[in-house]
A protein has these predicted regions:
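Domain-scale recognition of functional cores that engage charged ligands
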Residues: 1-183
Length: 183
C-alpha cells in the first residue's frame, strides 16, 4: 500500500546510507506541534523497515529553530498580519543548516519530505547518492592528507603545487593570489 513520506525516508536510507555495521542514521527536523506524531509513526514503522531491509535505525529528531523563522507575505508581497500581529513561518531549507550543524556526521544526505519517491523510482536516486558519497569521501580523504602534510610543515614545492592543483581542479577553489605560487 501507499507509504508516508517518513516511511519512504526509512526505505531510502536503508538503500544507500547504511554503514558497515548496518546502522542507518536518520534525522528528521519537524515542527514542535507534529513531533509526537512523527515519533509515534517511527515507533510503529521502524522495526518493520529494519526487518525488511536488514538494518538497524538510529532515528533522531530536532525542531527548526524559531530564530530562523521569516515573516509571511501576502499575495502583494506585503507582511501578513493575523489580528494585527505579524505572522512568522518556518524559514525553509536553508534555515535547517543550523540544525544540521548540531549533528556529528562525516556525510549527511539532505532529503525534503516533498521529493521522496516510491521504491520503483528509487534506483537512480540510490545510484547517484552512492556516487556522490563516494566522490565526497575520496575528496575528503585527500584533503585531510594534505592538511596533515601542511600541519607537519614538511612538504616540497612539488607537493605544494599538487595541493594547489587539487584545490583548483577538484574543489574548484581559485584565489588570484595563488598565481604567485604557480610561477
Amino acid at each position: 500500500g501507499a507509504r508516508t513520506p517518513l516511511e519512504e525516508h526509512l526505505a531510502e536510507g536503508a538503500m544507500y546510507a547504511a554503514g558497515k555495521s548496518g546502522k542507518v542514521n536518520v534525522h528528521f527536523t519537524v515542527s514542535a506541534e507534529h513531533r509526537e506524531l512523527f515519533k509515534k509513526l517511527v515507533e510503529e514503522k521502524a522495526g518493520e523497515f529494519a526487518k525488511r531491509y536488514g538494518v538497524d535505525y538510529n532515528i533522531t529528531f530536532s525542531e527548526q529553530k524559531p530564530s530562523t523563522d521569516t515573516i509571511a507575505a501576502d499575495m502583494d508581497n506585503q507582511p501578513f498580519r493575523d489580528n494585527g500581529k505579524l505572522l512568522f513561518r518556518p524559514g525553509g531549507h536553508g534555515a535547517l543548516i543550523e540544525n544540521l550543524n548540531d549533528l556529528d556526521a562525516d556525510v549527511i544526505f539532505i532529503k525534503n519530505i516533498d521529493n521522496v519517491v516510491p521504491d520503483k523510482l528509487k534506483a537512480d536516486t540510490v545510484t547517484y547518492k552512492k556516487l556522490i558519497a563516494g566522490v565526497l569521501v575520496t575528496l575528503q580523504k585527500q584533503a585531510f592528507e594534505y592538511l596533515e602534510l601542511l600541519d607537519s610543515g614538511k612538504y616540497t614545492h612539488e607537493q605544494m603545487m599538487e595541493m594547489l592543483q587539487f584545490l583548483q581542479k577538484k574543489l574548484f577553489c581559485k584565489n588570484p593570489e595563488t598565481k604567485d605560487l604557480e610561477d
